Amino acid sequence: MSLTDDQASKRQAYRAAKEANRKELKHVKIDDALPNKSSELDLPKKKFYRQRAHSNPFSDHQLEYPLSPAEMDWSKLYPHYYDAATNTMTKKVTVADIGCGYGGLMVELSRELPENLILGMEIRVQVTNYVEDRIIALRTNHAAQKEYQNINVLRGNAMKFLPNFFEKSQLEKMFFCFPDPHFKQRKHKARIITNTLLSEYAYVLKEGGVIYTITDVLDLHNWMVEHLNMHPLFDRLGDEWLDQDPCVRIMRHATEEGKKVARKQGDKFVACFRRLPNPELV
């Protein structure tokens, strides 16, 4: 459905105002209420950030990425954890939400995992902008409690550039929530779980780290389980573990896509796999 001129004008004005606010506050260390700002920032409205549900991961999206993890400047994303005296970060990112969508999982994980830095990677421009604006508002509105300092988002293509951001064995958890199912067989190569990509995930995951997957598409669930089962560096975790892990509970209910599935009374298929030790060379 096309927008009227008035609707398009309102969307443009809203986005321009949010962009100005984003440029001002995106990299600011928000520890206390900011001067010259109202005490509360409105959370962004999704209707002004509409974009296609999925994006072609093989397209040239003109993304910015570091040549290596050593060249990544994390201080811009997590200024609260940057030590200016030593010019170093006091923590590293250890949790990644791949294809984070509108950021619902990260927001909930922020309180569940307060000692972890959590990064969402999202390829769509407007969705990334929404999450940035959401985090800015949450940080500002909870400045006194210093909450939500441990989450952020960047626009990136995890299928191409993941090792450019993360060192070997850096991550403890990776989440793949309701990824694009790519139903057509000729599109299966674009799925986020493949043999080749699993080897990259194994590289950035520490031993004992966990891959979390959830989807409402049974065919995709079976595909992900099959490929993870076949990979020598991953072992599936049982139902008892799933029932006890708080991140699984959050993953089921916190994401925007998960809430939509729940409203439609659809199924949610969950599978988690632990990163095994590297085999000893003989």
UniProtKB/Swiss-Prot annotation:
Give the annotated active site.
Answer: 180
UniProt feature, compositional bias: Basic and acidic residues: 16-31
- GO BP: RNA (guanine-N7)-methylation; tRNA methylation
Q: Name one GO molecular function term.
A: tRNA (guanine(46)-N7)-methyltransferase activity
Q: So where does S-adenosyl-L-methionine get bound?
A: 99, 122-123, 157-158, 177, 255-257
Which pathway does it take part in? tRNA modification; N(7)-methylguanine-tRNA biosynthesis
- How is the quaternary structure described? Forms a complex with TRM82.
The UniProt similarity line reads: Belongs to the class I-like SAM-binding methyltransferase superfamily. TrmB family.
Q: What is this protein called?
A: tRNA (guanine-N(7)-)-methyltransferase
